Amino acid sequence: KKDIIITAGGKNIAPKNIEAALMEHPAICQAVVIGDRRKFLSAVVAIDPEKAAEANGDLNSFQSSVQEHVDTINKRFARVEHVRKFSILPRELDQDNGELTPTMKIKRRIVHDNWADVIDAMYE
């Protein structure tokens, strides 16, 4: 089954390439693009635990670095595929919380459910 996001404007977007581009950032270990039935794309990203430890768990310290990265990668994609907002998750996505399959693929619906408050805040 293909992962396709259909925006509120009816555009079909394949999130995989955008997520791969987000994960080019040295501190980002996981990225999930959000945007199904939404006006714009956003993303939730998890920071590599070692990098987070180096920052003493201060995930806000990654905010500007990740924002610069997002601005850079957005230039590669069509306007409709631009990530407008992102949130840094306080932990990695994992199998224990049902967010990953045994082969480490992301279960989008579970991520949406588990992080609904974080996701909804980006669209307020």
Regions found by a protein language model. Name each.
Residues 1-80, 92-96:
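AMP-binding/adenylate-forming catalytic core of the ANL superfamily
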Residues 5, 30, 72-124:
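Conserved C-terminal "lid"/linker of ANL adenylate-forming enzymes
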